[in-house]
Regions:
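Phosphate-coordination loops involved in phosphoryl transfer and adenosine-cofactor binding
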Residues: 1, 51, 136-139, 214
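An N-terminal-biased, well-structured beta-alpha scaffold segment characteristic
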Residues: 1-79, 193
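Structural/interface elements that position substrates and couple domains in central-metabolism enzymes
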Residues: 2-5, 9-12, 23-25, 84-86, ...
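Rossmann-like adenosine-cofactor binding region
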Residues: 40-45, 168-220
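Phosphate-binding beta-alpha-beta segment of Rossmann-like dinucleotide-binding domains, i.e.
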Residues: 80-139
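Glycine-rich Rossmann-fold phosphate-binding loop(s) that bind the pyrophosphate
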Residues: 145-146
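N-terminal Rossmann-fold NAD(P) dinucleotide-binding loop
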Residues: 149-150
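Gly/Ala-rich phosphate-binding loop of Rossmann-like dinucleotide-binding domains
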Residues: 153, 157
Length: 220
């Protein structure tokens, strides 16, 4: 029986599939052949001889010591794009939150609850504090047009935004998914100069370290 240790909470919908194929999936299995993780940091983990592979239920693998795994012949795999729709929705949600003080307005409404006849006057007086710009007509810069970035760019167009995208390594598959209305730019500086909002959709690597630095922020 193939033994898999889960080091984070994994949906039963996933673990049940493994169990149906004869795998033992538990958080306390000794010397498993596989690890299934999400956020667990394995950089200080001493790997055992039986370990064959590590699977991450997510896109990035920065919490896995890839060099060590390569030396020991441990296969590492992830799930790129699995969280793309959820992340796309959260990006738009965060832009809406940044445009208007929605959370503050919720707390303010709670604060005037129970004030009866005073509420209409309080609303009229206080509502202007929570006004904000629409996303429609604003400029969004998307850095990285992969599984997540392409979805963010396409959805932002539906909100009436002008979308510029930067990705010198865009795959053919991503290009097919991307709307023709996304403006492609060749330099990050154009994203920084023209954007009201920026969505950064790249993995953290040595090449992306300090991609957004003091100079980039100063040019915004």
């Amino acid at each position: 029986m193939f033994k898999i240790r889960t080091m984070n909470t994994i949906s039963p919908l996933g673990t049940q599939i493994l169990e149906k194929h004869g795998c033992a999936v538990k958080p306390d299995i000794e010397n498993p052949e596989a690890l299934l993780i999400r956020s667990a940091d394995l950089h200080s983990t001493e790997f055992w001889p039986e370990l064959l592979c590590i699977g991450r239920a997510g896109a990035g693998v920065n919490n896995i010591p890839l060099d060590t795994c390569s030396e020991k012949g441990i296969v590492v795999f992830n799930a790129p794009g699995a969280n793309a729709d959820a992340t796309k929705e959260m990006v738009i949600f965060e832009m809406l939150l940044a445009s208007r003080d929605i959370l503050g307005s919720i707390e303010w409404v709670k604060s005037i609850a129970g004030k009866g006849d005073e509420i209409p006057a309080l609303v009229e007086k206080g509502k202007s504090a929570f006004a904000g710009p629409e996303l429609c007509g604003k400029n969004l810069g998307v850095i990285g047009l992969g599984a997540i970035g392409a979805l963010v760019a396409n959805l932002a167009l539906e909100f009436g935004m002008t979308v510029r995208g930067y990705d010198p390594y865009m795959s053919v598959e991503s290009a097919w998914r991307l709307s023709r209305d996304v403006i492609h730019v060749d330099y990050l500086d154009e994203i920084f100069r023209t954007s009201d909002y920026i969505s950064l959709n790249v993995p953290y690597t040595e090449s992306t370290h300090h991609m957004i630095d003091a100079a980039a922020i100063a040019s915004m």
